UniProtKB/Swiss-Prot annotation:
PANTHER family: DOUBLE-STRANDED RNA-BINDING ZINC FINGER PROTEIN, ZINC FINGER PROTEIN 385B. This is Zinc finger protein 385B. GO terms for cellular component: nucleus. Residues 206-220, 260-269 have a biased composition (Polar residues). One of its GO terms (biological process) is intrinsic apoptotic signaling pathway by p53 class mediator. GO terms for molecular function: nucleic acid binding; p53 binding; zinc ion binding. Interacts with p53/TP53; the interaction is direct. It comes from the Eukaryota. The gene is ZNF385B. Residues 94-471 are annotated as: Interaction with p53/TP53.
Length: 471
């Protein structure tokens, strides 16, 4: 079937007929007969039809039809009705099932596919198990039905105290349980509590009688108030003297507001200080003496019962083998009223190990060292090996060294000498046996001088004695 010749003749006939009705019929016929049923391709012009009919794919399909074999369905993109067109555009339907284009498109103005909106919720509703599907299946359904699921925002986990961001909950949990976070939280709590405590002291200074505000109609209460006011006024001028006495004794100075309350001065002050430190440690979960942060009260109790904490307490009190001494020039720092663990500005001496340290950090390092632990446990000292020999003070070892050197200074046996000297030494030992070997090897003149004549070379007649000595 020669389609190109048929279309040429059809165009020549159309050129002769110039009427508008003939032109419309010509366009319709062109649409009808510009479709290749063999290759299932829509052609837009006679030139395309000619190029297609001369192509290899069209000839191959025509040959297969003539031989009685069904042609394979052509696979191409669905955009076959493009204006430019190509030689091999097809749709997914086979040639036998596909209807002519004119029947599907009554006019050229109608679009080939009508777009209709697809509701994403209804599309997801078609699949009841959409949320439990695999990610690959969800992606396929979203691509085919146009369901757009908004991407989930990554949850940002951050610590506002430490100014850190985390990638997971486990990282955040580990950070919250750590010591760095606990220290920063405690520092923030301390800064928040300080402004609350300062105005109370200032108010106590400004109004010394503010603690005696309740006034009743009884005369006895008024007399008690007057007595307390007198006691407070008398205690104010003597506060400087008591402060200087406390500084001389080496204890921590009391704040100036503490002198106004007579109950604090009369009662036992050190007991209340220890209790306040314990309460602060329980509240903050922090040991200010050892500078250790814990996560629970059980850990704090275990730390307080440990040997390190006990030795630090003994060093502060001076009751154990570790003694503390004030460092020179530390009184000026103590006058500033800086509160701490009580171990600042001090030097320490460990009586067990006979070691002097200069600071609290060095004391902690010494307490945690193996040397101190072995001494406390009563283990013997391990010898230290060094490449340098130190002079030992004991006279017995020095005497042994001298005796060893004298023994090594004895002359050598003749077997260690060269061959001519060895023969001479053997003859002399056979003829004369002296009681003690002297510095010279040959004493008796029994050997003729011809044997002792110096030979050629480096051999000498009377060589010096060879001695072995330590390095």
């Amino acid at each position: 079937m020669n389609m190109a010749n048929f279309l040429r003749g059809f165009e020549e006939k159309g050129i002769k007929n110039d009427r508008p009705e003939d032109q419309l019929s010509k366009e319709k016929k062109k649409i009808l007969f510009s479709f290749c049923e063999v290759c299932n391709i829509q052609l837009n012009s006679a030139a395309q039809a000619q190029v297609h009919s001369n192509g290899k794919s069209h000839r191959k399909r025509v040959k297969q039809l003539s031989d009685g074999q069904p042609p394979p369905p052509a696979q191409a993109s669905p955009s076959s009705n493009s204006s430019t067109g190509s030689t091999c555009h097809t749709t997914t339907l086979p040639a036998l099932v596909r209807t002519p284009t004119l029947m599907m498109q009554p006019s050229l103005d109608i679009k080939p596919f009508m777009s209709f909106p697809v509701d994403s919720s209804s599309a997801v509703g078609l699949f009841p198990n959409f949320n439990t599907m695999d990610p690959v299946q969800k992606a396929v359904i979203n691509h085919t039905f146009g369901v757009s699921i908004p991407p989930k925002k990554k949850q940002v986990i951050s610590c506002n105290v430490c100014q850190l961001r985390f990638n997971s909950d486990s990282q955040a949990e580990a950070h919250y349980k750590g010591s760095k976070h606990a220290k920063k939280v405690k520092a923030l709590d301390a800064t928040k509590n300080k402004p609350k405590m300062v105005p109370s002291k200032d108010s106590a200074k400004a109004n010394p009688s503010c603690s005696i505000t309740p006034i009743t109609g009884n005369n006895s209460d008024k007399s008690e108030d007057k007595g307390k006011l007198k006691a407070s006024s008398s205690s104010q001028p003597s506060s400087s003297e008591s402060g200087s006495f406390l500084l001389k004794s080496g204890t921590t100075p009391l704040p100036p507001g503490a002198a106004t309350s007579p109950s604090k001065s009369t009662n036992g002050a050190p007991g209340t200080v220890v209790e306040s430190e314990e309460e602060k440690a329980k509240k903050l979960l922090y040991c200010s003496l050892c500078k250790v942060a814990v996560n629970s009260l059980s850990q704090l109790e275990a730390h307080n019962t440990g040997s390190k904490h006990k030795t630090m307490v003994e060093a502060r009190n001076g009751a154990g083998p570790i003694k503390s001494y004030p460092r020179p020039g530390s009184r000026l720092k103590m006058q500033n009223g800086s509160k701490g663990s009580g171990l600042q500005n001090k030097t320490f001496h460990c009586e067990i190990c006979d070691v002097h340290v200069n600071s609290e950090i060095q004391l902690k390092q010494h307490i945690s060292s193996r040397r101190h632990k072995d001494r406390v446990a009563g283990k013997p000292l391990k010898p230290k090996y060094s490449p340098y020999n130190k002079l030992q003070r004991s006279p017995s070892i020095l005497a042994a060294k001298l005796a060893f050197q004298k023994d090594m200074m004895k002359p050598l046996a003749p077997a260690f000498l060269s061959s001519p000297l060895a023969a001479a030494a053997a003859v002399s030992s056979a003829l004369s046996l002296p009681p003690r070997p002297s510095a010279s090897l040959f004493q008796a003149p029994a050997i003729p001088p011809a044997l002792l004549r110096p030979g050629h070379g480096p051999i000498r007649a009377t060589p010096a004695s060879i001695l072995f000595a330590p390095y």
